[in-house]
C-alpha cells in the first residue's frame, strides 16, 4: 500500500483508540479556557500514545501533500510566526481582548495597542491560521484555548519574548559559531551563538547581570518559571517516586522546585536538596512553610558541589538538566562522583532527566509505513517541540543536548549500568541507572 493510504488508515485507527479512551472528554480549541486533561493534567497513557501517533502521522501527511518548493519556502520563512507571536506578547493582545469583553474588532484592537491596523491584522491572521486566537467574523477576534494562556498573569508572554527577542537575535550567531574553527566544537556558552550575536564573551546567564542585560531581566523572571511549569506534572507523575526507597536527593537542584513538587505528591518521602552555597537562600525560600519538616530532618538543604564525591546516602539521585551543560567526559565525571554513595547503598538509582533528542529513522524498506511506526520509545515525546527546544537551549545557553544512547554511554563511562528509560508524557525523559556490578566490586578511584 502507498504511504498516503497507510497514513490515512493509521490516523483513523489511532483516532478511534483516542476517542475510546477519552470518551466524552473530547476537548475544545475555540473556547478561551484550558482543556484540563491536556493543558493542566496529563491524558491517560493510552490517549497520550494515540495522540503522539496521530500528530506524527499528520505531520508526515502534511509533508506528503505539500509541494516541495512550498514546503521549503514555508520552513525558511517560519521565523515570521515567531515575529507574530512576539507582537501578540509585547502588545498583550490576549489581555486586551479580555478587557474588551472577550471579543474585539481589529480597528479597536489597533487603537488600544496604538499601532497600525493593517500590520496588526497581518499578525493576527497569521496566528489564527496557527490556531492561536480565532477570527470569528471578518476583522473580529477572540481568544481561543491557546491564546488564552498568553494572559500576563501566567508568565507565558515572558517566555515568548525571551525567544522572540534574545533567542531570535542569538540564532543569527549559530551558523558563524558552527563555521568558526575556534568555536565549532565548543559548548561553552561564552563562545556560543548568543555570545557571538551579542558581541560578548559570556553566556546569557551572566549577561543578564550586566547593565544591558538587566534591562531585559523582567521577562526572564516571568518566563522561565512558566517554561519550567510545563514539565512539572509529568515529572511528578511519570516516575514511580515511592518505589525507590524513602530518600530522594536532588543533585544540582537549582531553586528546589522539583523536589518540593515531588514532596507534595509523596509527603512520606525524605528530600535532600543540594546545590552550591549561593543557591542555599533561594532553596530555603522555596521550602518556606516546611520548617517543621526541616527541623525533623525530613527535608535537608545542603551545600554541595557535584564535582566532589557524594557523601549523602539516598535511595534515588535526581539530576535534572545537569548533564547537558558539560562535555561527555565532564558529565561522566559528575556521575562518577555518586559512586562512593552508591557503594554504600547499591540498590540506589540515578535518574538523569534531560531533553532526549528524538530521531525519525525511515529505512527504505519501510518507507511507506506510517511515520508513527518509526518513532523509538526511548526518546522524548513531542519530537518536533523537543527538537526546536534543544536547538533553542544550545543557541541561548550553550551546552550539549543528547540522544538516549549518548546519555547511556556517559553513564556507562561513569561506572553505572542502564536500567530503564522513563518516557514522560512531555518533551523530556529520564534515563535510570544503577551501580554497575563491576564498579561495585572495584575500589573507589575518587
Q: Where in the sequence are the language-model features?
A:
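Short, well-ordered alpha-helical scaffold segments within catalytic/effector domains
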Residues: 90-91, 171, 217, 229-234, ...
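Short, Φ-rich (hydrophobic/aromatic) sequence segments
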Residues: 11, 159-162, 174-175, 215-232, ...
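Alpha-helical subdomain
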Residues: 1-121, 135-137, 241-446
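Conserved alpha-helix/loop element of class I SAM-dependent methyltransferases that forms part
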Residues: 223-247, 261
Amino acid at each position: 500500500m502507498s504511504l498516503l493510504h497507510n497514513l490515512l488508515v493509521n490516523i483513523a485507527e489511532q483516532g478511534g483508540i483516542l476517542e475510546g479512551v477519552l470518551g466524552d472528554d473530547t476537548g475544545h480549541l475555540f473556547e478561551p479556557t484550558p482543556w484540563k486533561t491536556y493543558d493542566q493534567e496529563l491524558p491517560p497513557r493510552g490517549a497520550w500514545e494515540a495522540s503522539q501517533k496521530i500528530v506524527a502521522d499528520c505531520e508526515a501527511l502534511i509533508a506528503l501533500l505539500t509541494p516541495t518548493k512550498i514546503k521549503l519556502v514555508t520552513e525558511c520563512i517560519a521565523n515570521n510566526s515567531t515575529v507574530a507571536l512576539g507582537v501578540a506578547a509585547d502588545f498583550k493582545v490576549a489581555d486586551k481582548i479580555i478587557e474588551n469583553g472577550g471579543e474585539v474588532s481589529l480597528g479597536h484592537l489597533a487603537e488600544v495597542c496604538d499601532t497600525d491596523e493593517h500590520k496588526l491584522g497581518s499578525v493576527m491572521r497569521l496566528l489564527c491560521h496557527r490556531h492561536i486566537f480565532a477570527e470569528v467574523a471578518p476583522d473580529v477576534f477572540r481568544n481561543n484555548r491557546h491564546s488564552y494562556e498568553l494572559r500576563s498573569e501566567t508568565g507565558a508572554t515572558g517566555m515568548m519574548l525571551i525567544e522572540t527577542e534574545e533567542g531570535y537575535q542569538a540564532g543569527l550567531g549559530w551558523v558563524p559559531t558552527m563555521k568558526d574553527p575556534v568555536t565549532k566544537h565548543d559548548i561553552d556558552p561564552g563562545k556560543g551563538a548568543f555570545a557571538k550575536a551579542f558581541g560578548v564573551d559570556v553566556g546569557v546567564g551572566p549577561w543578564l547581570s550586566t547593565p544591558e542585560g538587566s534591562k531585559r531581566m523582567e521577562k526572564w523572571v516571568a518566563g522561565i518559571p512558566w517554561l519550567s511549569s510545563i514539565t512539572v506534572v509529568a515529572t511528578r507523575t511519570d516516575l514511580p517516586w515511592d518505589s525507590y526507597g524513602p530518600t530522594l536527593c536532588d543533585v544540582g537542584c537549582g531553586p528546589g522546585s522539583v523536589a518540593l513538587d515531588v514532596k507534595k505528591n509523596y509527603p512520606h518521602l525524605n528530600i535532600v536538596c543540594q546545590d552550591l552555597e549561593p543557591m542555599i537562600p533561594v532553596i530555603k525560600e522555596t521550602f518556606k512553610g516546611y520548617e517543621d519538616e526541616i527541623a525533623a530532618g525530613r527535608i535537608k538543604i545542603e551545600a554541595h558541589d557535584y564535582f566532589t564525591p557524594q557523601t549523602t546516602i539516598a535511595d534515588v539521585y535526581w539530576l535534572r538538566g545537569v548533564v547537558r551543560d558539560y562535555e561527555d567526559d565532564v558529565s561522566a565525571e559528575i556521575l562518577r562522583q555518586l559512586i562512593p554513595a552508591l557503594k554504600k547503598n547499591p540498590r540506589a538509582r540515578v535518574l538523569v532527566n534531560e531533553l532526549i533528542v528524538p530521531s525519525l529513522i525511515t529505512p527504505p524498506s519501510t518507507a511507506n509505513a506510517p511515520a508513527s511506526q518509526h518513532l523509538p520509545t526511548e526518546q522524548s515525546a513531542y519530537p518536533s517541540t523537543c527538537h526546536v527546544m534543544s536547538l533553542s537551549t544550545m543557541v541561548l545557553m550553550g551546552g550539549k543536548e543528547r540522544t538516549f544512547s549518548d546519555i547511556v554511554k556517559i553513564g556507562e563511562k561513569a561506572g553505572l549500568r542502564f536500567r530503564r528509560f522513563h518516557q514522560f508524557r512531555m518533551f523530556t525523559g529520564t534515563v535510570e541507572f544503577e551501580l554497575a556490578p563491576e564498579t561495585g566490586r572495584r575500589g573507589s578511584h575518587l
